[in-house]
Amino acid sequence: MDVFWYALVGLLLAGYLALEGFDFGVGMLMPFADTETGRARMRRTIVPLFLANEVWLVAFGGLLFGVLPVAEGELLHALRLPFLGVLCAWFLRDAALWFRTAYEGAGWRRTWDIVLAAASLFLAAGWGAVLGMLVRGLSTGSHGHAVASAADLTHPFTLLCAALAVTGSLRQGSLFAARSLPEGSSLRVAFGRLTRVLTPILLVLPLLVAALGTVATDAPVAVATTAVLAAVGVYASDRVQATGRTGVALLLGAAPLVALPALVGAVNGTTVLATRAGVGSLELSQAIADSASLALMTAIVLPALVLVALGQLWFWRVFAGAGNRR
């Protein structure tokens, strides 16, 4: 059961990244809409969907605290500066989405469009970098605990994972925004071209992750397998998109974003927080909550997650086409 709960925590994070990838991508693309009508329509494609998507982040944080209380504290300590940056970007992204319509001034709206794009870019890159560092393993501080050093943050493998998250989000955003724009509109055509440009890049990036992972991690086969599956997902997404099935293409196109948290488990196994030296690492057996707490969560959390998933399905069915209807 310990592995089940650990996997469920990872699944919630993967679900958050898969869904928020649309929002990150649309946010990054917002300033490139050439008219106010186009920018307003793009905003409506992700409002209020981004709130529903953030439920998975809240669920991830709550379950991490409940199931892996020791790991939660160690992760926040080791990654406090990267997490602080991601948290600030999250606040700014949400503020930009809400405050943009609070005042009619063109300068006001343009400013928030730029904030939205920058915060969305930082969010995508930040999550990619954090997960890349966890895959590779953190440094060990003088106190004997795991810590994310400047060298960890700027390592080529970390930067490559950040680039994968940004590019994957951009492709998802261009696909998602285009489906809500009028057929034949200049913005829809532009996003279609962008998708075609990003697809080959996103086919190559996972393979670069696999290549670099052979020397940056101790599990080259796990890295290569996960990365190749991500590339296959992108290829399948491109083929499906050519037939006009955008919904399925979006589902398959989330593969690179899902691959990032999957890599953490595939490479590190039951080591919840890995360090390259081994000192300061945290094993699942050390981090997991006691059996009484897990039994309580089995009775309460699992049914609640099922209800949340059903609510999400309804929410997406109702609001996913909001950009077209308003």
Can you annotate each of these PLM segments?
Residues 32-41, 104-107, 183-185, 321-324:
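Juxtamembrane helix-boundary/capping and inter-helix hinge elements in multi-pass membrane proteins
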Residues 5-16, 76-89, 117-121, 152-168, ...:
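Alpha-helical transmembrane segments
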Residues 166-180, 305-321:
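Transmembrane alpha-helical segments in integral membrane proteins
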Residues 99-246, 260-269:
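Long, contiguous internal "core" modules enriched in hydrophobic/ aromatic residues
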Residues 1-52, 58-62:
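N-terminal signal-anchor module of multipass membrane proteins
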Residues 49-120, 216:
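Membrane-interface helix-loop-helix modules in multi-pass inner-membrane proteins
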Residues 249-258:
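Central hydrophobic cores of alpha-helical transmembrane segments
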Residues 274-296:
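Short, membrane-exposed interhelical loops at transmembrane-helix boundaries
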